[in-house]
Amino acid sequence: MKIYMVGGAVRDKLLGLPVTDHDWVVVGATPEALTAQGFLPVGKDFPVFLHPQTREEYALARTERNSARGYRGFEVYAAPEVTLEQDLARRDLTINSIAAPAHPDSAKGLFEPDFDALVDPYGGQRDLQAKVLRHVTDAFREDPVRILRLARFAARFADFSIAPETLAMMWEMVTDGEVDGLVPERVWQELARGLMEDKPSRMFDALRACGALQHLLPEVERLWGVAQSAQYHPEIDTGIHLMMVLDMAAQLGAPLPVRFACLCHDLGKGTTPADVLPRHIGHEERSAKLLKDVCQRLRVPSECREIADVVAREHGNIHRSGEFSPAAVVRLLERCDAFRKPRRFADILLACECDARGRLGFEQTPYPQRPRLLQLLAAAQSVATDKVAAEAMAAGQSGPKIGEWIHQARVEAVRQSAAAAPAP
């Protein structure tokens, strides 16, 4: 029995990056041999075991073959005769197909990888040095999820290029309809992970380069080539703007719901009639409608969906909020449900800041709307609603009239706060 550290742990070690997750493969062993050493079997679809102390996963060496279209089934074969080279061959990219032999530390009951004796049959170290994302074998085409995974790695390793032969294979897979059969949950999973990388725009560059974005997110694909007013958008192209917004969200460390909102905030611009360009009147409502379609199709979690909907509808109003009257500000806060969900409102404002700064030449420009609206929200929240309601009832008011009294009290609080700190 031989044990190797494999995959991302080896790759990241060679790149000098922090190694968080350790993956191990066991060659020449049976399930019985591992359980006899205290390993706990947990694999449902193939033999995977947890180390009795570290709880890290150890998988028996295996081969895989696709048995259905669109990542709906794989035939797995795991046996002692499966070699390390065969196991590495099933992996997606050469940079993920490097193994480090592990030697047991008998005193600790652990395994220590030897990075001076790497096993690299498919040139992963060469591609790491050349900064190339390359498929290992033609088995890449058997799993269309690998297109999404490669695009995600393009976002993580932004200075890597895609090998021409790999891009050609991805094109063939898309042309053959392989991505059309992908399970929606898996598409969302990879999309979400890619959005959280350091350069999410590179994921969409990769998906566009192979034609996959048109199949997975046509609402996003159609934004390229759509003109915007150069006065407000010097980058002009809506697709370019969208990518700048996403990268700004990554730069500001935004959470996933904010990044998804950034992705979808301008979808409606893709349906603006050509004869009215570069104006996009009413694109906010069109964006919200298209967003609903995307969320239903990909089964997007409610937290992401709800923030994206508010951002799509209200980002223009938030940008212009410095011109609003106190009453208009309170109405905006009410539409954003800011009184019930102030933390979500803060995320909505962050998405709007990413939108404003995701423009050519505006990357370093302050966004005063964000701190100002948070200040005005705090002022409106300071209203003692119970006291106002009691006063309204004492004056003979009931039902919606009580809400109107509370609304007016909040307007007055915003008026006073705005007077103390006027909009810049």
UniProtKB/Swiss-Prot annotation:
Tell me the first and last residues of the signal peptide. Answer: none
Q: Where are the transmembrane segments?
A: none
- Similarity field: Belongs to the tRNA nucleotidyltransferase/poly(A) polymerase family. Bacterial CCA-adding enzyme type 1 subfamily.
Instruction: Reproduce the free-text note on domains from the UniProt record.
Output: Comprises two domains: an N-terminal domain containing the nucleotidyltransferase activity and a C-terminal HD domain associated with both phosphodiesterase and phosphatase activities.
User: Per its record, how is this protein called by name?
Assistant: Multifunctional CCA protein
Summarize where CTP binds, as residue positions: 8, 11, 91, 149, 152
**Which note does the record give on the cofactor?**
Magnesium is required for nucleotidyltransferase activity.
Q: Which reaction does it catalyse?
A: a tRNA precursor + 2 CTP + ATP = a tRNA with a 3' CCA end + 3 diphosphate; a tRNA with a 3' CCA end + 2 CTP + ATP = a tRNA with a 3' CCACCA end + 3 diphosphate
Native species of this protein?
Polaromonas naphthalenivorans (strain CJ2)
